[in-house]
Design a protein with these regions (language model features):
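Conserved functional hotspots at enzyme active or ligand-binding sites that engage polyanionic ligands
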Residues: 1-111
């Protein structure tokens, strides 16, 4: 069976086209949505990951992960067609990183 991105996976994906201050290019992203949603709909919710750490309040450090480094940009949620963008699994984050990302996203949404 073909790969379906799941919550907590880090995927390598092309974020172009982009506009303004959005992250762009071919880069890792943290999958937020579940495999059941992603497989059924063909889309996934994700946050880009960058190695350009700027200590912004919505950055979440990946920590000690041999496959990916940098920070998750929890305030830059994207809904992407993971099939059309050929998402490839790069690794998985810890539950602590996933929880912190979701908590920061909740702060963005709820204010």
């Amino acid at each position: 069976m073909a790969y379906i991105p799941d919550r907590g996976d880090v995927v390598w994906i092309n974020l172009d086209p982009h506009a303004g201050h959005e992250q762009s290019g071919h880069r890792p992203a943290l999958v937020l949505s579940s495999a059941s949603y992603n497989g059924k709909v063909g889309l996934m919710l994700c946050c880009p990951i960058t190695t350009q750490v700027k200590s912004y309040p919505f950055e979440v450090a990946i920590g000690d992960n041999p496959k990916v480094s940098g920070v998750v940009l929890a305030d830059q949620v994207k809904c992407l067609d993971w099939k059309a963008r050929c998402a490839k699994k790069q690794g998985k984050v810890s539950q602590a990183v996933m929880d912190e990302t979701l908590n920061k996203l909740k702060a963005v949404i709820e204010g």
